[in-house]
Amino acid sequence: MDSKTTFLTFLLCIFIFSHFSPSTSKSLTEKPLSFSPSASLPTLTAERLIKGFNLMPTRDVNVIDEEGSEAPRLVERAFDLPAAVDRRGSGGSPSVQDFGHHAGYYKLPNSKAARMFYFFFESRTNKADPVVIWLTGGPGCSSELALFYENGPFTVSNNSSLSWNEFGWDKASNLIYVDQPVGTGFSYTSDQSDLRHDEDGVSNDLYDFLQAFFKEHPQFVKNDFYITGESYAGHYIPALASRVHRGNKNKEGTHINLKGFAIGNGLTNPEIQYGAYADYALDMNLITQSDHDNLNRYYATCQQSIKECSADGGEGDACASSYTVCNNIFQKIMDIAGNVNYYDVRKQCEGSLCYDFSNMENFLNQKSVRKALGVGDIEFVSCSTAVYEAMQMDWMRNLEVGIPALLQDGIKLLVYAGEYDLICNWLGNSKWVHEMEWSGQKEFVAAATVPFHVDNKEAGLMKNYGSLTFLKVHDAGHMVPMDQPKAALQMLQNWMQGKLSTPTGRTAHQ
C-alpha cells in the first residue's frame, strides 16, 4: 500500500481534512497526541494553560468557593475580532458591535479536565429566529472551517482580514459552532480518559453543553432549535437529536425546543453508503464497468464485516476489521481515478489535501485573535488525530436506526448533498434515506421529485413526505454552503419555515 493510499484511508469522509496547511499536514503522519506525562500535553503544561485562559475563573472550576457554591461551568465573553472589515460600521456596513458575538468554554461535568470551546452568533435579522447548532465531522475536526469558509458571519482573506458573509446562516438563525469532541479545535483536556469513543459519550457531552448554554441565555429557550452539520456529523447529528428528544421526554433539565435536524453530505448508514461508491464512481466516469464489477465484489466482504461489527455491539476486532476492509473500496477508486478531488470530482486535487484552508489557521493562531477570543496560549487544532483514533470503532455504526422514532414524533429531517462529492456522495445518502423503514416510507418513496429553485433557477432536486426531506444540490461538492452559499441559506430558511415540504408536488421557491 503506497503512502497516498494510506493517507486517503485516514481521510475518508472527514469533513475538514482538506483544510490542513502544508505546515500542519505533517502532524498527520507523526505520532498521535498522547496525554501521558511525557507527551506533548503534559499535566503541568496543561495546568499552566488552563490557569492562563482569561475566560476561566481565577481559580480552577473544581474549587469550591467560600460560600460553598461551585464556580461556573460555562464562562463566556463577547468578542470583537480585531481584523474585521468595517468593524465599526464605516461605509454603511454593519458593525461587529451591533450583533451579539460570543465565545466561551464549558467544563464538561462528566470529565476530569475537559473544556469545550464554542462560538455563538446572535441573529443579524431577528433574535426570535431559531437557534441552530452546527457540528463538523472528522471525527475530531473543528467547526471553525464551516464558520470561516461556509456559513458563518465572516469570511477570511489572504491577509487575515475578515469581511461579512452575505449568506451567513446567522441571517436566519442564532448560530452556535462547537469544537467537539473534546480535543478538537480550541477544546482541550489534560486527561486521556476524557476522550470519547462513541456517540453516547459525544451526545451526552453536547446535551450537557446545551443545558448550560440555555441557562446562560434563557432568552433563547423558547426559540425553535435545529441541529445541523456535515460529513461525519452524519453520526453526531442523529445521536444528539435522539439525546435531546429523550431529555425532553424525561423532563431532564431545561426543555430544548427541538424542531428538526439536517445532515449535509453525511456518513450515517455505512453499510448502504459504502455500497454506493462503485455506482457513483461509474456514473461520474471515474472508473470503467469492469472496475465497477470488481469493486462490488469487495463490497460483499465489506457488507459482511459491517454486520459482524454490529453483532459485536460496535466494539472489538470486527469493527476495526470492517473499517479497514470497507475503506479499501474508496482506496481502489482513488487509485484508478488518479488526482481527482474526492470532495468535488469536477476538480483536480491541488496539493496533498486538495484544498488550502490555511488562511483560517493563520488567522486563529494570531496572538490578537486568541486574545479577543479568550483562549490564552492554546494553539488552534484543525483536526485531532487523537480524537480521530479514539472514535475509530464508532465509524461503521449505523446511526439511521434512531431516526424513525424522531420522524414519528414530528421532528423534521433534511438530508442534503452536493452532487459532485465522491466521499459522502448524494447517491449513497439517497439510498439510505429511501431504504429507511419508518411509517411514511412508502409515501416518501412514491413522492414526486421536484425542482428546488433559487432566483427562479433550478438549484437542486428534492422530494418530501411528512417530516422527511431529501435535497440533491446542483453545482456543489462536499461542502454545499461553500460551493452554493445562497442556495444553502435559502435551503435552511425554507426548511425551517416549512417551505421545503411539498407533499402536493409543488416546487419549493422563495
From Swiss-Prot:
Residues 1-25 form the signal peptide. GO terms for cellular component: extracellular region. The keyword Signal applies. One of its GO terms (molecular function) is serine-type carboxypeptidase activity. Ubiquitous. GO terms for biological process: proteolysis. The active site is at 231, 421, 478. Disulfide bonds join 141-383, 309-326, 349-354. It comes from the Eukaryota. Transmembrane segments: none annotated. Pfam families: Peptidase_S10. Probable carboxypeptidase. PANTHER family: SERINE CARBOXYPEPTIDASE-LIKE 48, SERINE PROTEASE FAMILY S10 SERINE CARBOXYPEPTIDASE. This is Serine carboxypeptidase-like 48.
